C-alpha cells in the first residue's frame, strides 16, 4: 500500500515540475523583452490580488495534478502535453446523498442536447429573414450567447391563398350543438390576399439563451464585486434571463388589435352580394373585448360563476348527450358578455338576398357590455379591493351595545351559577378595556373599525383555502367570518351566522334538569332575541350576528370566557386548546311554533328551482357523517383559538379552528 502511494507522489511531483517548466518557456517565448522585471508575487491575503477563474469541471490530467482546467475539450494543458485524445472529463467525488445517482445526472454544465454550433431550423412554410453564422465561443468573453434565429410571421409580400375553405383547419368539422349552415365554393375566395400583420419578430420557440451552453456560467466574479461567489453567480444568471426580456415583442393585445384591424372581410368574400360582416358589430367592440384583462374580464374568465359554486365543469345530462361539458350551458345564470342582440349562426346563410336580423347596433351597446363585464370582475360576494373598506366605513362599531346584548343573552340562556362565572371573567378585563378606549377619539374608533374590516379581507382569503372548520369573531363574541367547512359541520348557514337571516335555532344546549323550571323562559328566548335586532342604533343597524355563546353548550362557554380573561391582555402570543360541544342548528317544526325542537333536526327543504344550484345539486348532504358524532344535538369537538390585536393593542378578534 505504501509503495503505490509513493509511486503516485513521485508522478505528481514530476507532473508539477513539467508544468512549471512549460509555464517558464511560455513566458520567455511570449515576452519580447527578456530583461523585464520578474513576475510580481502577490500576498495571498491581499483582497485586491488577481484571482484565478474557477472552473466548474476538469479533465483527468488536470484533476490529478490539481490544476485549473478549462471548459473546452481538449483543454489547453492537454494540447501542450499532446494528450488531446485522452482529454476527458474527470469523475468528481460524489457526496453521500448522491451515491445512488447515475454519473449522467451529475453533469449540470453540458447537457445531452448541447450543440456548440447550432443551425437554424428550416421550415417549409416560413422563410428565415436573417441567416445566422456559425457561433464561436471565446474563452475571455463573458455572457456569450448563441444568436437566436428570427422568423417573420408572414413574408413581406402578400401571399395569395389558394382556397380559404381548404386552408381552414375546421372547414369540414361541425359542432354538435351549433345549428348547421350551408357553404358553397366561390372562385372569388381564391383571389383573396392576407396583408402583412406585423413586422418580423423573434421566434417564441427558443429561449433567449441556451441552458446547456457552458459559456453562460463564465461570469466575471471579480467585476461583480460580491462577497460570495454564489451570490455573484445567481446575479449573473438573473442577468442572462433579463437580457432576453428586454427584446420582448409587443403584447398579445396589441397584436390582436393590429390583426383585427388589418384583416377585412368585404362583400365579395362570401360571394352573395350582401355585406353581412360590416354592420353586425361595431368595429371597436372586438378591440374593447380583446383589451380587457385576461385574468379578470377576459372572454374565458368564467365570469358567470358568481353564485358561490365551485369553478368546475358540469357533467353532461347523460351518456347519450352530445352536449359538451360547459359551465355556460348548465349554469342557471346567463353569461354576461353583452351580446343580447347578436345574430345567431343561422342568420349567416349564403343564399343570395338574405340579410342579418340586426344590420346596425346602437352605440351604447359596446359600453353596456364592458360595464357588465366590469361588474362581474369582483371575485366573490365580498369585494377584494381595500379601498372599498376605507370608503364605506364611516362610523365606529357599537361595542357597548353589543356587550349589552351579550349580557342579556347570557342572563336568559344560562343558569345563575354559569352566569356568575362568565360575569366574573368579563369583569376582570373590563377595566383594561375602559382604560384603553378612554383617550380614543371618534376618528380613532373609525380607524379601528377600518383596520378590523381590512384584516377580515386577509382572513377571509385564508379561510377559503383552509380545510379545517374555522370562524373568526369580534371581541364581543359576534361571528365576523366563517368558512363553509364550519357550516357543513354544525348545520348553521353562513347567512344566519352573519345575521343576514333570522336565527330560528331551538337547540339551546341546556340539560333537561336545568331547564325544567324555566321552560317558558327558554321558549321565549328566540323571539326576544329577535326583537333585539331592531333595537340597535348607530353603526349596528340591521340584523344581529350570532354570538359564540349560542354555538357552544353551557360548560364550554364558561371555559371559553375564563380563557378569554387570561389571553385578552396578559398573553398576546398565547393560544388555548380545549374540548367543547358544538350545538347543531335545529329549526322549529312547521306545525308547532312554540319553539320545540324537531325530531329529525334537518333544515326545511327549499324549492330546487329557486336555488342557486338549479336542478344539478339541491342540497349538500352532510347529515350522514355528522349524525354519528352528535349526541342530543351536540358535537364532541376540540378547538384551538388565539386573539389578534389591533393597532391600539386591544383584542380585535379571535380566530377559532375546530377539529372533530
Swiss-Prot record:
Region annotated Disordered, chain positions: 1-52, 98-144, 170-191, 319-368, 587-613
Feature: compositional bias, Polar residues: 129-144, 320-332, 344-368
GO CC aspect terms: nucleus
Annotated region of DNA binding: 59-87
Zinc among keywords: yes
GO terms, biological process: cellular response to starvation; gluconeogenesis
Keyword Iron-sulfur: no
The entry's keywords: Activator, DNA-binding, Gluconeogenesis, Metal-binding, Nucleus, Transcription, Transcription regulation, Zinc
Acidic residues bias (residue ranges): 1-12
Localization in the cell: Nucleus
GO function term, MF aspect, one: zinc ion binding
Domain PAS: from-to ranges: 455-526
Start-end of Basic and acidic residues biased regions: 13-24, 36-49
Skewed-composition ranges (Low complexity): 173-184
Primary localisation category: nucleus
Protein name, entry field: Transcription activator of gluconeogenesis CHGG_09150
Organism of derivation: Chaetomium globosum (strain ATCC 6205 / CBS 148.51 / DSM 1962 / NBRC 6347 / NRRL 1970) (Soil fungus)
Amino acid at each position: 500500500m505504501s509503495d503505490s502511494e509513493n509511486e503516485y507522489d513521485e508522478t505528481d511531483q514530476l507532473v508539477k515540475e513539467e508544468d512549471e517548466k512549460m509555464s517558464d518557456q511560455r513566458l520567455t517565448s511570449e515576452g519580447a523583452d527578456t530583461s523585464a522585471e520578474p513576475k510580481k508575487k502577490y500576498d495571498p491575503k491581499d483582497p485586491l490580488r488577481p484571482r484565478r477563474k474557477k472552473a466548474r469541471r476538469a479533465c483527468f490530467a488536470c484533476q490529478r495534478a490539481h490544476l485549473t482546467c478549462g471548459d473546452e475539450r481538449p483543454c489547453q494543458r492537454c494540447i501542450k502535453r499532446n494528450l488531446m485524445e485522452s482529454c476527458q472529463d474527470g469523475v468528481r467525488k460524489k457526496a453521500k446523498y448522491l451515491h445512488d445517482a447515475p454519473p449522467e445526472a451529475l453533469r449540470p454544465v453540458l447537457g445531452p442536447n448541447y450543440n456548440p454550433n447550432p443551425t437554424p431550423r428550416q421550415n417549409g412554410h416560413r422563410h428565415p429573414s436573417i441567416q445566422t453564422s456559425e457561433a464561436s465561443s471565446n474563452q475571455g468573453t463573458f455572457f456569450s450567447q448563441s444568436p437566436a434565429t428570427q422568423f417573420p410571421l408572414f413574408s413581406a409580400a402578400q401571399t395569395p391563398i389558394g382556397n380559404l375553405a381548404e386552408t381552414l383547419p375546421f372547414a369540414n368539422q361541425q359542432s354538435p350543438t351549433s345549428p348547421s349552415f350551408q357553404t358553397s365554393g366561390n372562385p372569388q375566395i381564391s383571389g383573396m390576399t392576407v396583408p402583412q400583420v406585423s413586422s418580423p419578430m423573434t421566434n417564441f420557440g427558443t429561449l433567449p439563451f441556451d441552458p446547456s451552453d457552458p459559456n453562460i456560467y463564465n461570469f466575471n466574479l471579480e467585476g461583480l464585486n460580491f462577497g460570495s461567489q454564489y451570490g455573484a453567480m445567481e446575479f449573473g444568471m438573473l442577468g442572462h434571463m433579463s437580457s432576453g426580456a428586454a427584446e420582448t415583442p409587443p403584447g398579445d393585445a396589441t397584436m390582436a388589435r393590429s390583426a383585427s384591424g388589418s384583416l377585412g372581410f368585404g362583400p365579395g368574400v362570401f360571394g352573395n352580394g350582401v355585406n353581412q360582416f360590416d354592420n353586425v358589430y361595431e368595429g371597436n367592440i372586438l378591440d374593447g373585448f380583446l383589451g380587457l384583462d385576461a385574468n379578470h374580464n377576459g372572454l374565458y374568465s368564467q365570469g358567470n360563476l358568481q353564485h358561490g359554486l365551485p369553478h368546475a365543469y358540469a357533467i353532461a345530462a347523460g351518456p347519450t348527450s352530445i352536449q359538451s361539458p360547459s359551465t355556460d350551458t348548465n349554469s342557471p345564470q346567463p353569461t354576461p358578455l353583452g351580446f343580447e342582440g347578436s345574430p345567431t349562426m343561422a342568420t349567416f346563410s349564403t343564399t343570395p338576398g338574405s340579410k342579418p336580423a340586426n344590420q346596425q347596433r346602437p352605440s351604447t351597446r359596446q359600453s353596456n357590455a364592458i360595464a357588465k363585464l366590469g361588474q362581474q370582475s369582483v371575485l366573490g360576494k365580498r369585494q377584494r379591493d381595500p379601498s372599498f373598506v376605507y370608503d364605506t366605513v364611516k362610523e365606529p362599531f357599537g361595542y357597548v351595545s353589543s356587550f349589552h346584548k351579550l349580557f342579556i343573552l347570557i342572563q336568559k340562556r344560562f343558569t345563575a351559577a354559569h352566569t356568575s362565572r362568565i360575569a366574573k371573567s368579563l369583569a376582570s378585563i373590563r377595566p383594561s378595556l375602559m382604560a384603553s378606549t378612554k383617550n380614543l377619539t371618534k376618528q380613532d374608533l373609525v380607524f379601528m373599525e377600518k383596520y378590523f374590516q381590512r384584516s377580515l379581507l386577509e382572513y377571509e382569503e385564508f379561510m377559503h383555502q383552509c380545510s379545517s372548520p374555522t370562524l373568526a369573531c369580534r371581541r364581543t363574541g359576534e361571528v365576523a367570518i366563517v368558512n363553509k367547512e364550519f357550516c357543513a359541520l354544525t348545520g348553521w348557514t353562513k347567512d344566519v351566522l352573519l345575521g343576514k337571516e333570522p336565527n330560528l335555532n331551538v337547540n339551546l344546549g341546556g340539560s333537561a334538569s336545568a331547564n325544567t323550571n324555566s321552560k317558558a323562559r327558554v321558549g321565549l328566548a328566540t323571539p326576544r332575541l329577535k326583537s333585539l335586532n331592531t333595537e340597535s342604533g348607530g353603526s349596528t343597524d340591521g340584523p344581529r350576528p350570532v354570538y359564540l355563546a349560542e354555538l357552544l353548550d353551557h360548560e364550554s362557554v364558561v371555559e371559553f370566557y375564563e380563557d378569554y380573561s387570561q389571553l385578552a391582555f396578559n398573553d398576546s402570543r398565547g393560544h388555548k386548546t380545549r374540548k367543547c360541544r358544538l350545538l347543531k342548528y335545529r329549526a322549529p317544526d312547521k306545525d308547532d311554533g312554540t319553539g320545540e325542537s324537531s325530531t329529525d333536526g334537518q333544515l326545511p327543504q327549499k324549492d330546487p328551482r329557486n336555488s342557486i344550484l338549479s336542478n344539478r345539486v339541491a342540497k349538500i348532504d352532510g347529515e350522514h357523517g355528522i349524525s354519528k358524532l352528535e349526541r342530543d344535538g351536540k358535537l364532541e369537538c376540540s378547538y384551538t383559538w388565539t386573539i389578534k390585536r389591533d393597532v391600539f393593542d386591544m383584542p380585535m378578534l379571535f380566530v377559532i379552528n375546530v377539529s372533530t
